[in-house]
Amino acid sequence: MSEESRNHRKVYQGRVVSDKMDKTITVMVETYKTHPEYGKRVKYSKKYYAQDDNNEAKVGDVVRVMETRPLSRTKRFRLLDVVEKAVII
């Protein structure tokens, strides 16, 4: 099935913060919310575990992950694609 036929699933873009596990990456997704009273934008971040079958994503890469069925106790996302590779200095 393609991504277009699964429109109801959430797709997030975030940065890989860990790839030490086999076939699993940790992705940090940052979002902004506006404070209801003061109107200031506040940054929120959340970490998600995602399935990476080919171990292609590395730390620092910007990736897109899509919601899927539960793959383990904590894993509910799978890697769609690597948007931007990390620059190695």
Swiss-Prot record:
Annotated Gene Ontology cellular component terms: cytosolic small ribosomal subunit
Keyword RNA-binding: yes
GO MF terms, alphabetically ordered: rRNA binding; structural constituent of ribosome
GO BP terms: translation
CDD domains: Ribosomal_uS17
Keyword tags: Ribonucleoprotein, Ribosomal protein, RNA-binding, rRNA-binding
SUPFAM superfamilies: Nucleic acid-binding proteins
Lineage top rank: taxon: Bacteria
Pfam families xref list: Ribosomal_S17 (PF00366)
InterPro entries: NA-bd_OB-fold, Ribosomal_uS17, Ribosomal_uS17_bact/chlr, Ribosomal_uS17_CS
NCBIfam families: PRK05610.1 (NF004123), uS17_bact (TIGR03635)
Physiological role: One of the primary rRNA binding proteins, it binds specifically to the 5'-end of 16S ribosomal RNA.
HAMAP family cross-referenced by the UniProt entry: Ribosomal_uS17_B
Family: Belongs to the universal ribosomal protein uS17 family.
Oligomer status and interactors: Part of the 30S ribosomal subunit.
Entry protein name: Small ribosomal subunit protein uS17
Organism: Latilactobacillus sakei subsp. sakei (strain 23K)
Gene: rpsQ
